[in-house]
């Protein structure tokens, strides 16, 4: 019987191969063992702020690091075209069953994506720009695949915003984007993982 996976395992990831291996074994229980048990709220917050800032031009939408489709579920009522992209085929198989997405894309976000320039009207992402997962350089590729004026609604782990260079990256691309709005949100609700309740 395998040990239950958790936030500590996710934060220990070092390479894309680590991600593939972790989520291969975690996919079938991710929603119950992690999201439900920890009252994982980031996808809900993404949905809330997407509704706040979006307009009819923000389509199609790309859910970056979509995993099992938790963000897609929060956007599903928007009736807009949403595609999911993730490195884990097993996680994407769970997302596919939720019928939230028009297209499922298996890809490594640290490499050039097989997506045309200026295709998407919005990017959403929860829990991807965090320890061991995806760093700030991925923003360049996401800018390539989005239209001018595209809406980005992302969570970035607060401990990494400066440490991993997200602040410098955003400063470096500021001529290509509108002034960002920052909101501090709770990642977890009332029952978080005991080691990461303050994330």
Describe the residue ranges of each PLM region:
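N-terminal, positively charged/glycine-rich alpha-helical extensions of SAM-dependent methyltransferases
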Residues: 1-29
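Class I S-adenosyl-L-methionine
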Residues: 178-199
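A short SAM/SAH-binding and catalytic strip from SAM-dependent methyltransferases
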Residues: 121-135
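Conserved beta-strand signature within the Rossmann-like core of class I S-adenosyl-L-methionine
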Residues: 149-157
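A short glycine-rich, Lys/Arg-flanked "PGG" loop and its adjoining helix->strand segment in the class I
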Residues: 137-148
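Class I SAM-dependent methyltransferase SAM/SAH-binding core
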Residues: 62-112
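Conserved alpha-helix/loop element of class I SAM-dependent methyltransferases that forms part
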Residues: 39-57
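A short acidic, Gly/Pro-enriched loop at the edge of an enzyme's catalytic core
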Residues: 113-123
């Amino acid at each position: 019987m395998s040990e239950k996976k958790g936030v500590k395992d996710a934060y220990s990831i070092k390479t894309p191969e680590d991600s593939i291996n972790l989520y291969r074994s975690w996919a079938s229980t991710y929603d119950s063992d992690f999201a439900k048990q920890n009252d994982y709220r980031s996808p809900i917050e993404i949905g809330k702020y997407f509704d706040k800032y979006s307009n009819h031009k923000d389509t199609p939408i790309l859910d970056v690091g979509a995993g099992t489709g938790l963000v897609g579920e929060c956007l599903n009522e928007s009736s807009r075209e949403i595609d999911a992209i993730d490195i884990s085929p097993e996680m994407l198989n769970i997302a596919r069953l939720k019928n939230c997405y028009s297209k499922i894309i298996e890809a490594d976000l640290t490499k050039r994506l097989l997506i045309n320039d200026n295709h998407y009207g919005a990017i959403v992402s929860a829990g991807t720009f965090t320890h061991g997962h995806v760093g700030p350089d991925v923003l360049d590729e996401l800018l390539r695949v989005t239209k001018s004026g595209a809406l980005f609604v992302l969570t970035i782990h607060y401990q990494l915003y400066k440490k991993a260079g997200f602040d410098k990256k955003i400063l470096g691309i500021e001529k290509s984007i509108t002034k960002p709005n920052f909101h501090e949100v709770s990642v977890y609700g009332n029952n978080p993982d005991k080691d990461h309740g303050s994330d």
